[in-house]
């Protein structure tokens, strides 16, 4: 399924680059969740015994900053998805993340409107737009 933004009867229009960046950030959701968990479980490599190393100054702080940024993005996507009514969430999520067609339980335009709003809300909350 092609990635395009609805143009007619859509008050949630984004610039093309912003739209695609937001869609790909949403598609990266599962990897971000896995990375947030792995940052908690990872440990630095053992020291090599030399007095001066080539590593960064504070690896724990840099991992903490990285994890906070990932969690901020995850929360922004979750909050944007909550703006979609519960009965349409699965269809909208499947359309954006898994590129599935919309379910047949509601009209395609209804799902399209909610998908547009979801992507717009995610772009605003992620700070992309």
What are the roles of these predicted feature ranges?
Residues 1-83, 100, 126-129:
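N-terminal interaction/assembly modules
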Residues 91-92:
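A short pre-motif secondary-structure segment
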Residues 98-110:
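Helix-turn-helix DNA-binding module
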């Amino acid at each position: 399924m092609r990635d395009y933004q609805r143009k007619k009867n859509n008050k949630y229009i984004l610039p093309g680059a912003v739209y695609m960046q937001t869609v790909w950030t949403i598609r990266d959701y599962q990897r971000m969740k896995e990375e947030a968990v792995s940052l908690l479980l990872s440990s630095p490599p053992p020291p090599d015994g030399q007095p001066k190393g080539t590593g960064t100054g504070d690896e724990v702080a840099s991992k903490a900053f990285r994890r906070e940024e990932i969690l901020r993005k995850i929360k922004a996507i979750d909050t944007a998805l909550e703006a979609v009514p519960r009965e349409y969430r699965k269809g909208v999520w499947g359309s954006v993340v898994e590129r599935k067609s919309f379910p047949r339980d509601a009209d395609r335009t209804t799902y399209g409107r909610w998908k547009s709003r979801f992507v717009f809300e995610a772009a605003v909350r992620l700070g992309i737009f």
